Design a protein with these regions (language model features):
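Phosphate- and other anionic-substrate recognition elements at nucleic-acid/protein interfaces
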Residues: 1-135
Length: 135
């Protein structure tokens, strides 16, 4: 499985990718993109490149629910048929504090913490489904 952890913010997002079986990472540290369509396209291109390089098409994306800042990127990812998992930030914070993942907190490490949490708990997480309102 390719796990993608995204740390969501108002103006930018940081993401980290790892192939869970081999431990191969896309980059040594997180990649930063702007919170706009061109940033989302870069993320999509990087995911596709990493998937092609590893031969792994099982892609799961995890991000924390943070106000409204995740709304547009989730819509983009779902439109491109990615499996997106919304993770409660309290759970990733608890994992960080328990010592199972990095104990520091910064944007670069946050995406790695989310990625690790996604790998460790992938069987318990369910994909995000948009809320549909009917009249």
């Amino acid at each position: 499985m390719i796990a993608v952890g995204i740390d969501v913010a108002s103006k930018k997002h940081d993401y980290f990718m790892i192939q869970s079986e081999t431990g191969l990472t896309f980059r040594r540290s997180s990649v930063t993109i702007e919170n706009n369509e061109s940033g989302y396209k870069k993320l999509h291109e990087d995911i596709q490149a990493f998937s092609g390089a590893t031969g792994d098409s099982d892609i799961r994306i995890g991000l924390e629910s943070t106000g409204i800042y995740h709304t547009n990127i989730i819509a983009f990812l779902i439109t491109h048929d990615y499996e997106v998992m919304m993770i409660n930030p309290i759970l990733t914070n608890m994992a960080r504090k328990s010592g199972k993942v990095h104990s520091q907190k910064n944007d670069n490490l946050d995406s790695q913490v989310i990625c690790k949490y996604l790998i460790d708990n992938s069987d318990e997480l369910t994909p995000y489904t948009p809320i549909l309102y009917h009249r």
